[in-house]
């Protein structure tokens, strides 16, 4: 989405699709990969707002919710994994009261864009919804949030603060990996993708 901290990409399609590679590692029966808006497929409705200030807007999030509703008619259980910005989508879907969602895993994830903006001192995503009120709505879903000890894009302070706000909740866990934002996750995922996530 961004070439660097100050330059917006004209095409949000990742040059190194880590989330897709993580999905390929998973040996589950039915793995479905959802890209972000305007990745891989371009349309006349695509504009830079969709991968910058509006990336967590109501229209974007409701589109994913529609997909989730459709998938819920096909499968008895849904386990959501979100990488980087996709983690915010995963967290939002956890607030939709969909009974099919059994766990949430995030990897190097922007789990609260409002908090991240404060931590790294960037302009907030003004056209995106506020994530703070949503956190409690997903707190009964087993979650584990993986962060990289060398991640300079999404500092582990984000996960640490989230955990402190929810430290009394046994459903929410965080775990450190030896990784940066885009390096080290594939090897980590090979040994961790199938770890059970529960509220014990």
Q: Which residues are covered by each model-predicted region?
A:
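Gly/Ala-rich beta-loop-alpha elbow adjacent to hydrolase catalytic centers
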Residues: 81-90
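The feature captures the conserved acid-bearing segment of alpha/beta-hydrolase catalytic domains
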Residues: 109, 114-178
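Active-site signature of alpha/beta-hydrolase-fold catalytic machinery across serine-
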Residues: 92-96
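Alpha/beta-hydrolase active-site loop
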Residues: 46-73
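A conserved short beta-strand
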Residues: 99-113
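C-terminal catalytic histidine-bearing segment of alpha/beta-hydrolase fold enzymes
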Residues: 164-200
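Short, surface-exposed "cap/lid" segments of acyl-processing enzymes
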Residues: 1-35, 40-42
């Amino acid at each position: 989405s961004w070439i660097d901290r100050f330059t917006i990409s004209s095409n949000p399609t990742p040059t190194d699709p880590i989330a897709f590679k993580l999905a390929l590692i998973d040996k589950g029966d039915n793995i479905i990969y959802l890209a972000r808006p305007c990745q891989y497929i371009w349309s006349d409705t695509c504009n830079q707002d969709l991968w910058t200030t509006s990336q967590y807007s109501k229209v974007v999030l409701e589109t994913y919710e529609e997909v989730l509703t459709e998938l819920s008619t096909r499968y008895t259980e849904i386990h959501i994994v979100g990488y980087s910005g996709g983690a915010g989508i995963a967290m939002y879907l956890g607030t939709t009261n969909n009974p099919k969602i059994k766990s949430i895993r995030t990897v190097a994830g922007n789990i609260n864009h409002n908090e991240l903006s404060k931590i790294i001192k960037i302009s907030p995503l003004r056209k995106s919804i506020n994530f703070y009120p949503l956190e409690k709505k997903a707190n009964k879903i087993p979650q584990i949030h993986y962060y990289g000890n060398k991640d300079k894009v999404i500092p582990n302070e984000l996960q640490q603060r989230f955990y402190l706000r929810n430290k009394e909740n046994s459903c929410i866990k965080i775990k450190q990996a030896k990784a940066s934002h885009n390096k080290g996750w594939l090897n980590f995922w090979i040994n961790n993708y199938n770890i059970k996530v529960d509220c014990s």
